């Protein structure tokens, strides 16, 4: 009896190991190939993911095209973002936008403030009331996402949203610089 139980336990352990290895290494089919300017991610769309798209389009690849696949789709490769295992994905105390921004090494105060908003929204969701500008931006973007279920339409509108937000933040930054130069 003890022998049978031992054999069953060993078989169950072996099966568990096989399943864990399978889950860790991904499915049998290879990841889908992406065209040169195509970047891929999975649903759902949210502030950090849309901010990451905007950063890619404005600072990495002006010809970027985004493909959004259903959650659970196996994606891998150099132009995959905000999915497990991707270089540009949430890691410890960094959101996806933080990871992209760190790689860019760009000095742009307005863009950096947008990335900071993404960070606050992604990592401080339960304390967002402490960051009113980020909270407002999150609410505005959520409204765009909810009203536009088609990912392509939604991406177009969110890129316009981030361009507008960027222009507003640049104007505020320039105004502050002008006041400091004038001694105000």
Per-segment meaning from a language model:
Residues 1-7:
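Feature marks short, highly hydrophobic, charge-poor N-terminal signal-anchor/signal peptide-like helices
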Residues 8-20:
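Hydrophobic membrane-insertion alpha-helices, especially the h-region
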Residues 24-36:
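Ser/Thr/Pro/Gly-rich low-complexity linker/stalk segments immediately outside membranes or between
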Residues 33-36, 53, 61, 71-92:
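Conserved non-transmembrane functional hotspots
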Residues 36-57:
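N-terminal, charge-rich interaction modules
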Residues 67-69:
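A short, structured beta-strand/loop element
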Residues 78-115:
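A recognition module on extended beta-rich or small alphabeta surfaces enriched in W/G with H and D/E
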Residues 103-184:
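A charged, amphipathic interaction segment
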């Amino acid at each position: 009896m003890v022998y049978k139980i031992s054999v069953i336990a060993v078989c169950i352990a072996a099966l568990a190991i096989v399943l864990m290895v399978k889950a860790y290494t991904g499915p049998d089919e290879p990841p889908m190939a992406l065209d040169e300017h195509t970047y891929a991610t999975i649903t759902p769309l949210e502030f950090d993911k849309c901010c990451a798209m905007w950063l890619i389009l404005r600072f990495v690849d002006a010809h970027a095209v985004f493909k959004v696949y259903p959650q659970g789709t196996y994606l891998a490769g150099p132009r995959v973002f905000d999915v497990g295992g991707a270089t540009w994905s949430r890691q410890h105390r960094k959101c996806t936008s933080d990871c992209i921004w760190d790689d860019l090494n760009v000095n742009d105060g307005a863009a950096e403030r947008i990335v900071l908003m993404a960070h606050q929204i992604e990592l401080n969701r339960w304390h967002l009331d402490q960051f009113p500008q980020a909270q407002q931006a999150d609410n505005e973007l959520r409204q765009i996402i909810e009203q536009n279920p088609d990912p392509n339409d939604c991406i177009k509108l969110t890129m316009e949203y981030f361009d507008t937000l960027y222009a507003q933040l640049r104007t505020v930054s320039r105004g502050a610089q002008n006041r400091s130069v004038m001694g105000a």
